Amino acid sequence: STRVRSSAASDVYKRQRYGVKYPSIWLKFSDDLLAWEDKPSHLLIAGREGTWEEKIGGSTPPILTEAGWLTLYHGVADGGTAEYRVGALLLDRENPLRVLARTPEPILEPEFFYETEGFYSHCVFPTGNVVVDGVLYVYYGGADKYVGVATCRLEELLNYLTEKCRCE
């Protein structure tokens, strides 16, 4: 069988088209969730050269908290050939285009065998999350072979973001 993958040429085209050097996360807004084509795209965050998050992408759905919108994303260094790790953003409640905080280092990275050995080794890739009784449950793929769940107290993560990771 043939496996279809994004080519380097395609990635370069996309970056040139949108005027960014590295893969980025964008936002669009729609009143009816049906009409998107005529809506403008807004750059939220871009990858950072020479860091653990040179190449980034959206992951879990945002969670509305009193502090703002909590959003997790994945990042990978070396142009996408290194470990996939997880970072967090805190966006303004009223204007989610405004990034209030961004973790400088990953909050989750490959550590256990089910994250380091598999189809794509050294990869944690969050795909879903939920808060139950103040605990954030993050469901993620490990090494593109396993499914895992990581937990933390939501309040602790929000405190870390607001006290240590402010963008302003």
Language model regions located:
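Entry beta-strands of beta-propeller and related beta-repeat scaffolds
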Residues: 10-11, 68-71, 135-137
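Loop/turn-rich, solvent-exposed surfaces of beta-rich toroidal or solenoidal domains
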Residues: 57-103
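Beta-propeller blade signature
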Residues: 24-32, 85-94, 151-158
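Residue-level signature of beta-propeller blades and closely related beta-rich strand-turn architectures
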Residues: 15, 75-77, 142-144
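Short, solvent-exposed loop/turn segments at conserved positions within beta-propeller repeat blades
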Residues: 18-23, 80-84
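Blade-level signature of beta-propeller repeat domains, shared across WD40, Kelch, NHL, RCC1
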Residues: 130-164
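Single conserved hydrophobic/aromatic residue that forms the stacking wall/gate
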Residues: 1-13
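Surface loop/turn signatures of beta-propeller and other carbohydrate-active proteins
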Residues: 7, 34-63, 96-128, 157-168
